[in-house]
Regions:
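RNase H-like, Mg2+-dependent phosphodiesterase core
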Residues: 1-181, 191, 195-206
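Short, non-ligating residues that shape and space the ligands of small metal-coordination modules
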Residues: 187-189
């Protein structure tokens, strides 16, 4: 028996990311969502990696993974932390990264499309084959009602080139630096100039 984990929406402007788990032997499928807030102001902190891991572990628990059951994970970098955590929990011999195709891919994709339709947006039929066209189609939908910005991954640094996003959410490229308090490497949404201390998100909250 094998459980296959895939994602949909990582490269799409709208909504968060759907993560689904599928047991091919029984056609069982379940999914959950990384909230879009992880792709907004805190995007450069990459907290979505830990959230992806949390969701994957929850979905596998929900499917009641059996001893020795193989778990195959999509090759996408969104699962880097999840793979590490899964290997620690279930063993390296159980976990592998694959290119997901077929039924699990279809189910996760359909779940993402259902979620964005729930926002009131109708996706392009050829969205997968025309990613650039889909991006601008989504952006146009947001532009007709700027209140829809709350549904967008506004933390993407590349969006700063578009007036629609820069005027609402001033997006700066993330810079790697050292936290002045704990000494750990962290990313901040500005370029440190050495004139003031810089704190990671954990130390900032303390």
């Amino acid at each position: 028996m094998t459980i296959i984990v895939d994602d949909a929406g990582s490269g799409d402007l709208l909504f968060g990311v759907v993560i689904g788990a599928y047991r091919e032997d029984t056609d069982q499928f379940t999914y959950d969502v990384i909230d879009v807030s992880f792709y907004q102001e805190v995007f450069c902190e990459k907290k979505f990696l830990n959230e992806a891991s949390r969701i994957v572990l929850k979905l596998i628990k929900k499917l009641k993974a059996k001893p020795g059951e193989k778990i195959q994970i999509c090759q996408g970098c969104i699962f880097d932390t999840a793979v590490t955590d899964l290997k620690e929990k279930y063993g390296e011999e159980i976990i592998s990264k694959i290119r997901v195709i077929g039924e699990p891919q279809r189910l996760v994709e359909e779940s993402y499309l259902d979620e964005i339709r729930n926002l009131g947006y109708e996706p392009l039929k050829d969205r997968e084959s025309k990613r650039a066209k889909s991006f601008f189609h989504m952006m146009k939908w947001i532009k007709t009602n700027p209140k829809r910005l709350k549904f967008a991954k506004t933390g993407w640094p590349r969006l700063k080139r578009y007036k629609l996003f820069s005027r609402v959410n001033k997006i700066e490229p993330c810079s790697k630096t050292i936290c002045s308090k704990c000494g750990k490497t962290c990313e901040v949404p500005f370029k440190p100039d050495g004139s003031r201390p810089v704190f990671c998100s954990d130390c900032w909250k303390k």
